[in-house]
């Protein structure tokens, strides 16, 4: 087994390897789609609870709203890409095994290794704990988004150069004020996500095979 961060080659031909989702995989996909519907709904509610949006749905802070929406959409796209790759892994592994049995060498090009996510997860592990084994699942990307980017901090309206804009609300000690409603919305989204079956990443499945 050899690994390389970059690989050059020519004369390569590509063919389609089709994977038919099983009924169980379709059910899991639909469940995650439902969880994202909850996250999207809770995100809109949290933007109102924190003061980014007003009661009518109009925004008081276009930059804050655009940032929250952008992070959500990029997380959603990355998640479903990794989820589908994880579901395709069994078919990929069988093709690799067939090629190896035929005496061929297999080159696997991995677009994302999840290295940055793994580093963040390791940073949360106590230095005294023994790390026996661990695995990353696509839903960890979503949990990371909810923990780090979901809007929970209250905003206040201030006038700057004649324009009303929103900025983070701070308490007397200078700490950011957390909206309890937004915090509850985030917790509900995380709880629903954690109840769903984790699908190991494609890379982990290939390494374990």
Which residues are covered by each model-predicted region?
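Conserved helicase/translocase motor-coupling segment
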Residues: 2-122, 193-200, 206
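ASCE P-loop NTPase motor core, strongest for the SF2 helicase catalytic module
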Residues: 78, 83-119, 127-209
């Amino acid at each position: 087994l050899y690994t390389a961060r970059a690989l050059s080659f020519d004369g390569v031909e590509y063919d389609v390897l089709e994977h038919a989702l099983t009924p169980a995989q379709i059910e899991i996909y639909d469940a995650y789609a439902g969880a994202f519907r909850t996250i999207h709904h809770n995100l809109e509610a949290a933007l109102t609870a924190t003061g980014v949006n007003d009661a009518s749905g109009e925004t008081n802070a276009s930059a804050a709203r655009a940032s929250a929406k952008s992070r959500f959409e990029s997380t959603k796209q990355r998640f479903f890409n990794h989820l589908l790759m994880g579901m395709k892994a069994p078919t990929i592994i069988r093709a690799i095994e067939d090629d190896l049995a035929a005496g061929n060498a297999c080159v696997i090009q991995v677009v994302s290794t999840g290295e940055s996510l793994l580093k963040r997860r390791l940073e949360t592990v106590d230095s005294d704990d023994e790390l026996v084994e661990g695995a990353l699942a696509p839903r960890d990307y979503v949990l990371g988004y909810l923990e780090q980017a979901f809007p929970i901090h209250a905003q206040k309206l201030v006038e700057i150069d004649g324009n009303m804009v929103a900025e983070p609300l701070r308490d007397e000690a200078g700490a950011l004020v957390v909206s309890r409603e937004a915090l509850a919305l985030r917790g509900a989204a995380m709880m629903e996500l954690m109840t769903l079956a984790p699908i190991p990443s494609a890379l982990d499945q290939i390494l374990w095979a």
